C-alpha cells in the first residue's frame, strides 16, 4: 500500500521551549520525519527559542543530538539538510527580552505562509506568551499549539481559555492531545461510520456494556512532582479515556470536519451522569523489593501521598442511544502489560434455538489501539464433531500490520500527524475550549468527593491488573474485565 503525502503550505514554526524535553523527544523528531517523508515544503522554517544564550550554530548541534537520540533514523546528509531549516532566537517567554529579534525573521519573508507558535512550556506561561505575541503584532492569522494539561480543574481551565481567547480566536487555538493523533484512535471513527455491519447494532438494544482499558507498565519516573499533584483521574481519565469514550459513543457527525465532530463529542460529555462514589475505584501500586521496584509513595518521595496511580469507574450516558448500557473505564501505572483496548460486549441472543446444552454465547468486538493494533470479532459457530449442536466461540482477527503492510506496521507518529494538521488548519483532532470545560465539569465532583470523604487509594501489586476492588466493581454487575494482554 502506497502512502499518500499530502502537501502543506510553507510555514514558520516557532517553538517556545525549543531546548526542552518535549521539543527534543517529540516535536523536532516528528518534524524531521516529515522532512524525510517529503512533506516539508521548500522555505519552511523552524525557529527554536529559549532563555539560554545559544546561537543558531549551537542550537543546530542540540537538534542534531536530539535527532540521533530520539529519531533513530536518517542519514547524516538528511540531518544536515534538515538543520538548514532550523534557526534560534533567544527569547524570554516570561519577559520582554528577545521579542523584537524574533519578529525580524518572521516579517522578512514575503508571500503566503502559515505562522505557528508551539507553547512547549509550562501552562502558567501560556497567558503571557499569548499577550506578547499579540502585542508584538504576530497574532494576526497565526495558530498557537498548547499542550495538556489544559488546567487542573474547571476553574483553571476556564481561566486558561479566557486568557487565550483575549488574543486569539478559537479557530487559531490547537489544544494538542497526542493520544488523538494515534492512527488506531482515528480508526475508531472509520470502524464505526464506515461499516454498516456495526452502526445499526451500536446502541443499548444490542450492546450489553463497553470496556475501555488503557494500561501502562511504566511508573511515574521523570514526572513525580507533576503526577503526585494530578493523579490518574486528571492525567489520563479526564482526557485520553474521555476522548476514547466520546469517539465510541458519539452520534454520527453530519460530515467529517472539526466542528461537526467536536459538537458530537461535546454532546456525549454533557450527557454523562455524575459518577456515584460506589462506582469508582482508586488504586496505588505497591513496591516489590525482590524486583527492585519502589512503591508509588517511595517513587514520588511522599510517604503520605493519597494520589491514585490507578482508577476504574462505571459511567452512564443518558441519551436515547446509550441509556441502560454501562461504560467501564480503567487506567493505571505499573500494570501487568502495556495495552490500550476497547471491548464492545454485545448482548446474548434473546432466545437460543439450540437449547441450554449448546451453551450461551455473546459476540465481542475488540479494538486494539496499542501495542498490536487491530480488530478481533468473536463469533459463534458449531463445535466440530458429532456430539450434537455444541457452540464454540472463534475469533476473526485482523492485525493492521498484516492487513496494511508497511504502512500499517509503521504508522505515522502522533506528533507528526498533529503538527501537519495544525499547518493545514484542520482542528478535528484537537479539543475545543467548551469540550475541555465540559470534561472538567464531569471530573471535578469525583475528585472533590475523594477529598471530602478522605478516601485513600487501594494498594495493588506491581505487574498486576490493579486492585481487587476493581474486579468487584464488575462482579457486582455480573460482569468481568477482559484480560490485560500485551
PLM region spans:
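Secretory/organelle targeting and membrane-embedding segments
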Residues: 1-145, 150-486
Amino acid at each position: 500500500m502506497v502512502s499518500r503525502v499530502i502537501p502543506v503550505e510553507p510555514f514558520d514554526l516557532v517553538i517556545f521551549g525549543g531546548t526542552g524535553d518535549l521539543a527534543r523527544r517529540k516535536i523536532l523528531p516528528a518534524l524531521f520525519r516529515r522532512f524525510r517523508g517529503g512533506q516539508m515544503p521548500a522555505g519552511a522554517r523552524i525557529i527554536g527559542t529559549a532563555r539560554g544564550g545559544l546561537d543558531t550554530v549551537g542550537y543546530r548541534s542540540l537538534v542534531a543530538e536530539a535527532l540521533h537520540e530520539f529519531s533513530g533514523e536518517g542519514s547524516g546528509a538528511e540531518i544536515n539538510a534538515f538543520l538548514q531549516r532550523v534557526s534560534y532566537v533567544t527569547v524570554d517567554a516570561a519577559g520582554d527580552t528577545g521579542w523584537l529579534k524574533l519578529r525580524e525573521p518572521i516579517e522578512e519573508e514575503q508571500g503566503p505562509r502559515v505562522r505557528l507558535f508551539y507553547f512547549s512550556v509550562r501552562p502558567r506561561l501560556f497567558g503571557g506568551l499569548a499577550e506578547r505575541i499579540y502585542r508584538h503584532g504576530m497574532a494576526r492569522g497565526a495558530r498557537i499549539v498548547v499542550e495538556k494539561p489544559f488546567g487542573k480543574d474547571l476553574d483553571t481551565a476556564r481561566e486558561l481559555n479566557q486568557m487565550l481567547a483575549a488574543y486569539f480566536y478559537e479557530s487559531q487555538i490547537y489544544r494538542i492531545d497526542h493520544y488523538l493523533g494515534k492512527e488506531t484512535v482515528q480508526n475508531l471513527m472509520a470502524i464505526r461510520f464506515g461499516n454498516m455491519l456495526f452502526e445499526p447494532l451500536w446502541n443499548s438494544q444490542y450492546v450489553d456494556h463497553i470496556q475501555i482499558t488503557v494500561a501502562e507498565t511504566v511508573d511515574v519516573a521523570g514526572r513525580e512532582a507533576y503526577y503526585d499533584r494530578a493523579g490518574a483521574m486528571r492525567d489520563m481519565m479526564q482526557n485520553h479515556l474521555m476522548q476514547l469514550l466520546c469517539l465510541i459513543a458519539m452520534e454520527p457527525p453530519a460530515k467529517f470536519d472539526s466542528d461537526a465532530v467536536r459538537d458530537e463529542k461535546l454532546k456525549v460529555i454533557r450527557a454523562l451522569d455524575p459518577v456515584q462514589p460506589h462506582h469508582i475505584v482508586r488504586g496505588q501500586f505497591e513496591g516489590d523489593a525482590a524486583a527492585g521496584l519502589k512503591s508509588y509513595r517511595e517513587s514520588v518521595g511522599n510517604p503520605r501521598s493519597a494520589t491514585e496511580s490507578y482508577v476504574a469507574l462505571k459511567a452512564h450516558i443518558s441519551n436515547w442511544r446509550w441509556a441502560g448500557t454501562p461504560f467501564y473505564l480503567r487506567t493505571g501505572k505499573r500494570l501487568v502489560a502495556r495495552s490500550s483496548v476497547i471491548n464492545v460486549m454485545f448482548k446474548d441472543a434473546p432466545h437460543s434455538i439450540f437449547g441450554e446444552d449448546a451453551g450461551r454465547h455473546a459476540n465481542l468486538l475488540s479494538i486494539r489501539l496499542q501495542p498490536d493494533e487491530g480488530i478481533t470479532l468473536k463469533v459463534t459457530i458449531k463445535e466440530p464433531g458429532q456430539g450434537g449442536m455444541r457452540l464454540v466461540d472463534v475469533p476473526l482477527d485482523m492485525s493492521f500490520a498484516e492487513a496494511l503492510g508497511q504502512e500499517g506496521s509503521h504508522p505515522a507518529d502522533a506528533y507528526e500527524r498533529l503538527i501537519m494538521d495544525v499547518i493545514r488548519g484542520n482542528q478535528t483532532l484537537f479539543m475545543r475550549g467548551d469540550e475541555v470545560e465540559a470534561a472538567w465539569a464531569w471530573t471535578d465532583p469525583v475528585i472533590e468527593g475523594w477529598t471530602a470523604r478522605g478516601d485513600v487509594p487501594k494498594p495493588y501489586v506491581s505487574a498486576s491488573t490493579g486492585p481487587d476492588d476493581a474486579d468487584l466493581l464488575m462482579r457486582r454487575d455480573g460482569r468481568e474485565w477482559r484480560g490485560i494482554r500485551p
